[in-house]
UniProtKB/Swiss-Prot annotation:
One example GO MF annotation: lysophospholipid acyltransferase activity
Annotated GO biological process: phosphatidylethanolamine acyl-chain remodeling; phospholipid biosynthetic process; positive regulation of fatty acid biosynthetic process; triglyceride biosynthetic process
Job description of the protein: Lysophospholipid acyltransferase involved in fatty acyl chain remodeling of glycerophospholipids in the endoplasmic reticulum membrane. Selectively catalyzes the transfer and esterification of saturated long-chain fatty acids from acyl-CoA to the sn-1 position of 1-lyso-2-acyl phosphatidylethanolamines (1-lyso-PE, LPE), with a preference for stearoyl CoA over palmitoyl CoA as acyl donor. Acts in concert with an unknown phospholipase A1 to convert palmitate PE species into stearate ones.
Lineage: Eukaryota, Metazoa, Chordata, Craniata, Vertebrata
PANTHER family xref list: 1-ACYLGLYCEROL-3-PHOSPHATE ACYLTRANSFERASE-RELATED, ACYL-COA:LYSOPHOSPHATIDYLGLYCEROL ACYLTRANSFERASE 1
Reactions catalysed according to its record: a 2-acyl-sn-glycero-3-phosphoethanolamine + octadecanoyl-CoA = 1-octadecanoyl-2-acyl-sn-glycero-3-phosphoethanolamine + CoA; 2-(9Z-octadecenoyl)-sn-glycero-3-phosphoethanolamine + octadecanoyl-CoA = 1-octadecanoyl-2-(9Z-octadecenoyl)-sn-glycero-3-phosphoethanolamine + CoA; a 2-acyl-sn-glycero-3-phosphoethanolamine + hexadecanoyl-CoA = 1-hexadecanoyl-2-acyl-sn-glycero-3-phosphoethanolamine + CoA; 2-(9Z-octadecenoyl)-sn-glycero-3-phosphoethanolamine + hexadecanoyl-CoA = 1-hexadecanoyl-2-(9Z-octadecenoyl)-sn-glycero-3-phosphoethanolamine + CoA
The protein's name: Acyl-CoA:lysophosphatidylglycerol acyltransferase 1
Pfam families according to UniProt: Acyltransf_C, Acyltransferase
Species of origin: Mus musculus (Mouse)
């Protein structure tokens, strides 16, 4: 489609702004990620002497890095409106977030809306597709202890065993609290047809806005962090270094992300900011772990039911622009999530000052050695 004379200045501004944002993102990554790695390296003696304190400091830096990613969307006008139950109330408890997956922007949205939930981001473990391991943020996630999972039948059983070992060695020993999981196993646009064919074959509901979840990873997480806890031996790593024993996994947070007109934001849009300001809506429901069945067949049915309910939530949202009110209430209440501009300024300043500091330290040692 040809660009008119009237549209040319506007299009030029969009392109110029996208280029400036991209340049800033590159600079941000070049100072923040190497600085994070350098701090982690220099703090290794503390990891041996006081593991809990080491992972606390690492978690803070991890939260700041995710805050920087969140700020890219924030200053492009991509904000979040929260609905449903207040998850701040359980920020210090162990929980699993089950999230529907539409696009790469889902991860950025969660990075933003969880920033004001106390220690959650610092003590969080992500389960994400292995392709993210090869992004600029992959090394940070590897150090933090996030898990990269390969999709596909050929890898499924082997990956679940690796996940089980990963939880046993890294979850509680690093004082992790929340796990973020996308049970659909892929983006909506890629899995919808396969899911609908599976539903038709097995007499399950026909879903449009979500796909039927895969239960494998959820099953492994619950067995590792709930079942063994009941037998008196804390799962997820050696907890002897912790000041008090963990009470185990306590909550499932059913999280539903909805975009206006069902048009999701991808990571390119989040970085370049060429889309008009958009409000993403996130709905939370909290389920006590005692209400979640642990037997495979019952757990599968329970998960299916949650995603059938997600379908209803999203259908209502796309028709009305709002999520339905909870049972017994006439109107749903939403909360605008905000980021502090001062906090963003401080973490960005720390990142660039750290980058400057480490550059000169490395340069000094390089000249001393060579």
């Amino acid at each position: 489609m040809a660009v008119t004379v009237e549209e040319a200045p506007w299009l030029g501004w969009i392109v110029a702004k996208a280029l400036m944002r991209f340049a800033f993102m590159v600079a941000n990554n070049l100072v923040a990620i190497p600085s994070y790695i350098c701090y982690v390296i220099i703090l290794q003696p503390l990891r041996v002497l006081d593991s809990k304190r080491f992972w606390y400091i690492e978690g803070l830096m991890y939260k700041w890095l995710l805050g920087m990613v969140a700020s890219w969307g924030w200053y492009a006008g991509y904000t979040v409106m929260e609905w449903g139950e207040d998850i701040k109330a359980i920020a210090k408890d162990e929980a699993v977030m089950l999230v529907n997956h539409q696009a790469t922007g889902d991860v950025c949205t969660l990075m933003m809306c969880l920033q004001d939930k106390g220690p959650v981001v610092a003590q969080m473990m992500w389960l994400m597709d292995h392709i993210f391991k090869y992004t600029n943020f992959g090394i940070v996630s590897l150090i933090h202890g996030d898990f990269f999972i390969r999709q596909g039948r050929a890898y499924r059983d082997q990956q679940l065993l690796v996940l089980k070992k990963h939880l046993e060695h890294n979850y509680r020993s690093r004082d992790r609290k929340w796990i973020v999981l996308f049970p659909e196993g892929g983006f909506l646009r890629k899995r919808r047809e396969t899911s609908q064919a599976f539903a038709k074959k097995n007499n399950l509901p026909f879903l449009t806005h979500v796909t039927l979840p895969r239960f494998g990873a959820t099953n492994i997480i619950l067995k590792a962090l709930v079942a063994r806890q009941e037998n008196g031996s804390p799962a997820g790593g050696d907890a002897r270094g912790l000041e008090c024993k963990s009470r185990g996994l306590q909550w499932i947070i059913d999280t539903t992300i909805a975009y206006p007109k069902a048009e999701p934001i991808d990571i390119q849009t989040w970085i370049l900011g060429y889309r008009k300001p958009t409000v993403t809506h996130v709905h939370y429901r909290i389920f006590p772990i005692g209400d979640v069945p642990l037997e495979t067949e019952d757990l599968t049915s329970w998960l299916y039911q949650r995603f059938i309910e997600k379908e209803d939530l999203l259908s209502h949202f796309y028709k009305t622009g709002a999520f339905p009110p909870p049972q017994g209430q006439k109107e749903a209440v939403c909360r605008e999530m905000t980021l502090s501009n001062m906090w963003i300024f401080l973490i960005q300043s720390f990142a660039f000052l750290s980058g400057y500091l480490w550059y000169h330290i490395i340069q000094y040692f390089y000249h001393c050695l060579f």
